[in-house]
């Protein structure tokens, strides 16, 4: 798969026009969020879930998006409460949030579901601490140990037929554990549950390209060629980096307590600048596009980056998402890879990204934010 190259020093004319049009209107971002939120409210099922009942993470993403919508509490409270109750009902004795699936060793994408559910439940403020602490135990016990390239990472399931970890699941796990770390103060007896953050960081670094045109970019995992393979000048074959995984690496490194001045973070952000695009998930085209928008926003917000090169990412991303919203308030990807033909999933991703596009302070830039 070929990757499009983009100019680094100047924003494209389309991006400038979109940002100018977006900035000139008083509330297109808030209007888009309200329309998307009302779509989610209308699509919630009677038992409180969204989409596939076997995948509590899909409901959790809807809850998370509603919690951060900014709409008056009385308009979203009941839907959030019903979603929270549904997710809590999927918690197993081992602390994970998932629906067992015998064909997958019984785990039912336990790591993925539990990480997303833990973050959403914490944001909701409506889940008992005991349930969240059990989920933290589940995630911590799912981190792979050892000394190989998988060590420190997370796969889809705690139990699987083969040893496996990838950057997407790892980023969700690290985000959930860092986001909820304050809960450990509530754990009785002075005990604490946490990850091996050094191992997690090593796992992320191992997936980052050190040289060549993709330097600073990150691959999905050490085995699966999601975006293809490439051979460097020494003849070494490796997996090609792409956009969403590079932002996942940035987010993960921030959670591992690296700041944007760290050379590893800077190199990843330079890759993001080099291949800046909101028309595609760089290196993957339309595959996983709405996941890409969400992880981009979360990573750049966590790194406290106000602009990527000349690109004001908040304004450009908000303008792009507003332009993609469908008349019924939803978003949907025509490419079904990673379940993105589901408008509930894409709408949740889009809302979470838009909610991070709100300016952090008057003037659009806090003292801690910088332009890359």
Predicted regions, residues:
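N-terminal secretory signal peptides that target proteins for export/translocation
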Residues: 1-8
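Bacterial N-terminal signal peptides
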Residues: 11-20
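An alpha-helical repeat/solenoid feature that recognizes helix-turn-helix modules
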Residues: 26-35, 49-79, 93-137, 142-319, ...
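Secreted/extracellular ectodomain signature
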Residues: 35-37, 84
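Active-site-surrounding "flap" and adjacent substrate/cofactor-binding loops of secreted or lumenal enzymes
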Residues: 84-90
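Short, solvent-exposed mixed-charge patches
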Residues: 370-372
């Amino acid at each position: 798969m070929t990757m499009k190259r983009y100019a680094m020093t100047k924003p494209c004319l389309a991006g400038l026009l979109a940002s100018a049009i977006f900035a000139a209107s008083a509330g297109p971002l808030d209007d888009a969020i309200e329309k998307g939120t009302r779509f989610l409210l209308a699509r919630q099922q009677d038992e409180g879930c969204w989409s596939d009942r076997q995948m509590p993470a899909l409901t959790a993403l809807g809850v998370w998006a509603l919690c951060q919508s900014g709409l008056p509490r009385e308009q979203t409270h009941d839907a959030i409460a019903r979603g929270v109750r549904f997710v809590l009902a999927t918690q197993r004795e081992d602390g994970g949030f998932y629906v067992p699936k015998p064909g997958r060793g019984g785990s039912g994408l336990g790591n993925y579901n539990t990480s997303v559910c833990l973050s959403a439940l914490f944001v909701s403020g409506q889940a008992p601490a005991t349930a969240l602490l059990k989920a933290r135990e589940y995630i911590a016990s799912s981190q792979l140990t050892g000394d190989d390239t998988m060590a420190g990472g997370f796969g889809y399931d705690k139990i699987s037929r083969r040893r496996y970890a990838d950057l997407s699941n790892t980023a969700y796990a690290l985000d959930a554990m860092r986001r909820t770390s304050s809960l450990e103060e509530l754990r009785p007896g002075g005990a604490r549950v946490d990850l091996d953050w050094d191992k997690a960081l090593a796992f992320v670094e191992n997936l980052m390209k050190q040289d060549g045109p993709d330097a600073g970019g990150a691959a999905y995992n050490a085995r699966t060629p999601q975006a293809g393979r490439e051979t460097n000048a020494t003849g070494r074959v490796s997996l090609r980096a792409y956009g969403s995984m590079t932002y996942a690496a940035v987010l993960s490194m921030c959670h591992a307590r690296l700041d944007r001045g760290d050379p590893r973070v800077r190199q990843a952000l330079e890759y993001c600048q080099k291949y800046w695009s909101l028309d595609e998930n760089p290196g993957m085209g339309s595959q996983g596009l709405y996941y890409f928008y969400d992880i981009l926003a979360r990573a750049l917000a966590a790194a406290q980056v106000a602009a990527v090169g000349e690109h004001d990412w908040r304004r450009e991303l908000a303008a792009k998402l507003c332009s993609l919203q469908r008349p019924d308030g939803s978003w949907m990807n025509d490419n079904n890879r990673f379940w993105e033909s589901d408008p509930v999933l894409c709408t949740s991703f889009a809302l979470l990204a838009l909610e991070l596009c709100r300016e952090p302070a008057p003037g659009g830039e806090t003292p801690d934010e910088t332009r890359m």
